[in-house]
Amino acid sequence: MGHRKHSQPRRGSLAYLPRGRAKSMEARIRTWPDVKAEQPKLLGYAGFKAACMRIASIDDREKTPNFGKQLVGLGTVVVTPPMSIIGIRGYSKDRYGIDSTFDVYAKDLPKELSRLFKTKPDEKAIENAEKSLAQIDELYAIAAVLPRKAGLEQKKPYVFEVAVKGGDIAKQFAFLKDLLGKEVKIDQVFQRGVEVDVAAITKGKGIEGPITRWGVKKKQHKSRKSVRALGTLGPISPATIMYSVPRAGQRGFHQRTQ
């Protein structure tokens, strides 16, 4: 390879570090949008990837090279079975952070939930929760999705929290109280044509080398000892390998949001 006048940009992005396995098959939502609305609404839904497809469309963006031409892209089909609202959780904030104050569960839970946990029916749970609404800062719906309703053979359900925004705490609790023990469909959460953020876990690939994992360049075919390896691990000082050096490790099974 000839001499370069300028150095080449690094191969592989550092924006997704650490590239480790996700802790769960369920995506973790750390921040929910702040919706300014008079009526409360759920902000999330769950689905399963069903298939991939090709989408042919006409480019309607003006001042682009492909304006008026046909574009072919990839699309993903997501099946969204009904989501059961099995509980309500209230959080309160203090100087140390956010803590769970109460949990209210529906009386008749799906039998598949016994694979995860068991709850005792508490008739006064709703009354006690209503009395403590003054110290509640956030309310979440405890939702469950049964894979069998999506045509999957998995018996273990997925249980997660969905944020509720809009109105005050009293309106949000009344909204969740009305949905408790019922099923919610996706058209009750999202409208047709809206843009949403999708968080999911990618397909796991196992342990991969630096060539595949980071996309670094291979060495010449007659190089000593190795070809699909790095030429250097860094400078002699400091006497450590920096985190930015591409190394072998886990590839896939990461959480990504689009």
What residue ranges belong to the model's regions?
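Extended basic (Lys/Arg/His-rich) segments that typically form rRNA-contacting surfaces
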Residues: 1-258
